[in-house]
Amino acid sequence: MFARLARALFGSANDRTLKAYQRRVPEINALEPAVQALSDEQLRHKTTEFKERLEKGETLDGLLPEAFAVCREASRRVLGKRHFDVQLIGGMVLHAGRIAEMRTGEGKTLVATLAVYLNALSGKGVHVVTVNDYLARRDAEEMSILYSFLGLTTGVIVPNLSDGERREAYAADITYGTNNEFGFDYLRDNMKYSLADMVQRPFNHAIVDEVDSILIDEARTPLIISGPADDSSDLYRSVDDVVVKLVQEPDVYDKDEKLRSVTLTEHGSHRVEELLAEAGVLQDGGLYDIHNVAVVHHVQQSLRAHTLFTRDVDYIVRDGKVVIIDEFTGRMMDGRRYSDGLHQALEAKEHVEIQQENQTLASITFQNYFRLYPKLSGMTGTAMTEADEFAEIYHLDVVEIPTNLPVRRIDTDDEVYLTAAEKFSAVADLIKEIHETGQPILVGTTSIEKSEYLSHILTQRGIPHNVLNARQHEKEAIIVAQAGAPGAITIATNMAGRGTDIKLGGNIEMLVKASTEGVEDEAQRESVEQNIRAIVEEHHEEVHKAGGLYVIGTERHESRRVDNQLRGRSGRQGDPGNSRFFLSLEDDLIRIFASDRMGAMMQKMGLKEGEAIVHPWLNKALEKAQKRVEARNFDMRKNTLKYDDVMNDQRKEVYAQRREYMATDDLSGVIAELREHTIEDLVHAHIPEKSFAEAWDTEGLTKEVSRILNLDLPIADWAKEDGMDSEGVIERIEAEAAKAQAARTANMGPELMRLIEKQVVLTTFDAVWKEYLHGLDQLRQGIGLRAYGQRDPLNEYKQEAFQMFTAMLDDMRIRVTETMCRIQAVSEPPPFPVINTETSGPSEEPAGLFSQGTTGGDIPAPQPMAGFPSAAPMPPRPQPVPTGAEPDAATLQRWYAETPRNALCPCGSGLKFKHCHGRLA
């Protein structure tokens, strides 16, 4: 009550924020006549003028009115679109590092150009982040015309680009791309071996389109770069055969749909043990014996695959592969795989080829990636429902931007039925009724399965319609273009919710593009375009009179934002429209989360088959259920962030140290320091402090010095000398080690040794970091059990992660020291037969292997150089026969400096440099 009274008297916080921005709008509008009087060349020169003024000390805020006026005029001339006043406010919100909530059809893409242009003037780059590759390409293509007119460059990051193309795109003033591509490029850059090979510049400003989808919906899913692990496909198949039998029996597992978890009952544990033993999968002993721990893991993942994941809802099988379906967009997520063996369990369930498991090499969550940007802003049609999360996690305020024209859409109360069959029958009845009026209809479903079920009903009734889901995603553009035509019926999964604009009468641009594809004659193209424009304008009037787009939702989603996205397809830019949701007691949201009393109360009302209940009370009850789900998901994301923050600080430290090593030409000082630390640790481990020589473990120390430092020293004789202590031993060992290193450097030459030192440090750093990530994954999976011992899992995780990180650094020092002490030059490669090998081109990055929350392929591990010890014995690799005369030392050193490791060797052997003469470096 008091809150409502305060809002009435003083306005909401959003109102006060808008007023502050609205005061600047007249200032921008006042500049319009003068800017319109400028020639194209004078308008373009304004960009140069703004840059010069920035260099002299002016601020971006100071330039804002003029820059916005220039961008607005350029847009009017080049794109034929002039920014409305409310769009100017949206641009100011984005520039301020906030989130602009703008209704569908209000021109978010155009709004972004204002903030993008202003912030690109600094020359530090602006990243515009979209949810898929199609939107990245489309927006970059459409808006590059504007930016080019203003003298700015535009790049776009999409899959399958080379490093050179990526570097060029990031060097542009404005770079478009998806959240996945930006994130993976960051991880890949931090796996490179030279600063020159990195593609990204230091971060400056990111503007995230559909910010709620990327920063909220996908926040819990980490980006992971991975390499191959052990193959256990046979075990997955054997366990799957057992679980198929198991799930058909009663009382063998407990399933919690709220938490999406499943556990074996005591009876189930005994039963699975019997089935595994019969199948010959279980080794001696019980299921939970230590040597069967891998089998337990496989059983758990197979059980999840069979009980929690449904084909055509959570994933589809396409071309013999299991492809994940994004629960928020309904789109296929090609290249992404579930981690921790779950994807392999699904492949076994569907009897397709089981891909190899992978091991994490590098990972980061979107939460931590986007917090790397000094300035972050975003835009979406639905953000206010998650305003608290944006503020708490990202320190971003949400500002609701008013529409340019009032919203005329009529939102009808939900209709709730007893069963799903009754619900879909009622939906079909309404579709038939509305279709006869000529009003276009968009029907939203939550899965492929349900969209095809409704399509089957409409087909039986002879009602023409289009289906848009992950199976028909190739036809998306043309289906969406026609969705606003008179009488059009479109059944869509959530994929129609984002990045699409359904215009009444049809989308002229999309229809023209589809109709003129392959037509080269300009006159013919113009004729086709004129005909389409005339038809669409006629259809627009017809649909407008019929009542606009009618949106029908067949189920409430867990998130109110997804429902609002669907509603928002209708009533764009002041158009008329309607929306209505049809629900049943069998819907997941009501069945799992809504009050149990709802079903009982409806049944007590004595509803007959086919009857529905419509009441605002039901809407409120459903909204409460959605809020509970959203709060639960928020808590889960916060919890994920707390754990990831532990590694995030370590990741920043590791990547910063690694970049420092890459930027340093001479690492001999670092090598010497690591060696000194290693020697001190060795001596202190074998010589107790302030002890007599008799208590020294000289034999153990001698063996370790020989193993790690490759030195045979008379340490036992030193111990007999008067006055000898641990410090004296350290000094002597260090002197001998330094002498040996100097001899190796003299033998190989200082320049070559510097290259080898850098290679050793970076490859060792990567190896120990990879092993640390694997250990951290294992720790994270089991840390929750500490709660049963009355200990805080998060604190336990922090303590153990710190201990593991310290141990990782110690391990790195020992490995680098051991490798450098055993390095030796090889005059020429051994004479193995020439083997024909395929090359992937001169790119160091493993392309196409990246996924969210899992991996999609193999990454070859860095190959050790000649004479290097490796963590595990490796079979000898085929080596080339040198062709022609061997290069001289000067040529070799030039090759080492200029030739990428994965490029073909300049000697002409046909092998990669790293497998040929690059073996020496």
Swiss-Prot record:
Keywords: ATP-binding, Cell inner membrane, Cell membrane, Cytoplasm, Membrane, Metal-binding, Nucleotide-binding, Protein transport, Translocase, Translocation, Transport, Zinc. Its EC number is 7.4.2.8. The keyword Plastid does not apply. ATP binds at residues 87, 105-109, 501. Residues 831-886 are annotated as: Disordered. It catalyses: ATP + H2O + cellular proteinSide 1 = ADP + phosphate + cellular proteinSide 2. PROSITE patterns: SECA (PS01312), SECA_MOTOR_DEAD (PS51196). NCBIfam families: PRK12904.1, secA. Belongs to the SecA family. This is Protein translocase subunit SecA. The gene is secA.
